[in-house]
Curated annotation (Swiss-Prot):
InterPro entries cross-referenced by the UniProt entry: Arc_rbn_hlx_hlx, Ribbon_hlx_hlx
Entry's Gene Ontology BP terms: positive regulation of growth; regulation of DNA-templated transcription
SUPFAM superfamilies xref list: Ribbon-helix-helix
UniProt keyword annotation of Acetylation present: no
Listed name of the protein: Antitoxin VapB41
Task performed by this protein: Antitoxin component of a type II toxin-antitoxin (TA) system. Upon expression in M.smegmatis neutralizes the effect of cognate toxin VapC41.
Keyword annotations: Toxin-antitoxin system
Amino acid sequence: MKTTLDLPDELMRAIKVRAAQQGRKMKDVVTELLRSGLSQTHSGAPIPTPRRVQLPLVHCGGAATREQEMTPERVAAALLDQEAQWWSGHDDAAL
């Protein structure tokens, strides 16, 4: 996934230097650093386990037709479309 981050200049220089010293791509160095940072706990405390939440149940008038059914593929396509609209600055899919 591509994303844009606004990082301090000194941080980017350090990442570039590390990548050059290790003969690696910057994206690989950043990925490694993010994974390492996210796997560490703060102040020695264990990472909390995710808690279960209860989502609301939405009742509909009837069963969805095959064209209306929300398959994983349709959800992924809708999310990609929404992200593309967001990046283009036109959020027509806003609720």
